[in-house]
Amino acid sequence: QMIHTSPQLLRNSRTLQQAIQGTFDVEIDVEYTHIGELVDRIDDKVLDNYFRNVWQGEMKKYKYSGLALIDEINGLKPRKVLDIGCGYHEFKGKIDNIVGIDPYNDAADIHVKLLDHHPDEKYDATIALGSINFGSTDKIYAELEHAVSLCNPGAVMFFRANPGLPHDKSESNWIYFYPWDS
């Protein structure tokens, strides 16, 4: 919307960079070949800032978090478990054979976005607790399809959608939380 209302911003990279920093409180390279590339870069940086600096895990808040999920997954005796958007990787050391991926948190085993994760082996169990919630319907479907493609036949997926509760941090104002209830 900022660019739509002030298209002259695109003509001056310094002014554009200042406008982006002033609006989103992030610094990015503003060189781009198409506007979608710039928008994606802003989105990535806003998410990175939110999940690195603002968001804190709430392991005990939901049914499929914490000890109940740990016991359930370990009871399956999976050879390999994927934790998508593992955050602080709180399941590491508690669930056998777990691999945590997260593009924004240094605790992850692999720093990668879900759609860019292409392991050599598939998983017997997958956890996605509030991590497939950001972006358009097309992006959500693509992420869900990719998560399923990473699983062996008969694998189990534990999934939790964004509960639809407002996020009280101002840094979340620019993040699109997928409306699962609509």
Put a short name on every predicted segment.
Residues 1-117, 158-182:
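Class I (Rossmann-like) S-adenosyl-L-methionine-dependent methyltransferase catalytic domain
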Residues 71-74, 145-149:
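Surface-exposed alpha-helical segments enriched in charged/polar residues
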Residues 79-81, 124, 148:
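N-terminal hydrophobic or amphipathic segments with adjacent small-residue motifs
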Residues 115-126:
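A short acidic, Gly/Pro-enriched loop at the edge of an enzyme's catalytic core
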Residues 116, 133-134:
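Active-site micro-motifs of SAM-dependent methyltransferase domains
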Residues 128-131:
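A short beta-strand submotif of the Rossmann-like class I SAM-dependent methyltransferase core
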Residues 134-146:
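A short, conserved alpha-helix within the catalytic core of class I
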Residues 151-157:
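Short glycine-dipeptide loop
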